[in-house]
Amino acid sequence: GVVLAVRELHAWGYLKSFPTLVAVQAANCAPLATSFSQHSEHVLDVLTKPTIAEGIASARPARGAQILAEMRALDGRFVTVGEQDILAARSALASRGSYVELTSAANYAGWLKYKETYVHEADRSVVFPLCGAGLKSAH
């Protein structure tokens, strides 16, 4: 979805260049991030554990090979976030008036991790989705 949107915005002239795409996965279930870091063209079988970010918990993501290829073609990045990072991100967002569900909180945690990991890119403008009410989760 995001790749298609970025490609269309570029084709229509709304983007002069492609932005850096950052994909976030929970550390407990990160087959794409693992496959990407190991330069695999296909999603590798990885050991996964349950994660509180249920919306991104997929050991065999649909179109995984396509996602890996698109992220490479667009010079994308992957980051993984731990369960405590996700909970802390949701608390931080809630303190600012946005009570989101945990999968969305993983996006914010991913942005924080991205800033730590790619310090030289930390001052860039970012867009990340925050959707889903926090009342959806028992955590």
Language-model features: locations:
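Short Gly/Thr/Asp-enriched flexible loops that form oxyanion-binding sites at enzyme active sites
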Residues: 1-9
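Phosphate-binding loop/pocket of nucleotide- and phosphate-handling active sites
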Residues: 16, 44-47, 70, 105-139
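Short, glycine/acidic-enriched capping/hinge loops at junctions between secondary-structure elements
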Residues: 1, 33-34, 138-139
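Phosphate- and divalent-cation-binding pockets in alpha/beta enzyme and binding domains
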Residues: 1, 31, 89, 109-110
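Gly/Ser/Thr-rich beta-alpha loop segments that engage phosphate groups in nucleotides
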Residues: 2-3, 28, 134-136
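Active-site/ligand-binding loops adjacent to catalytic centers
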Residues: 8-18, 22-102
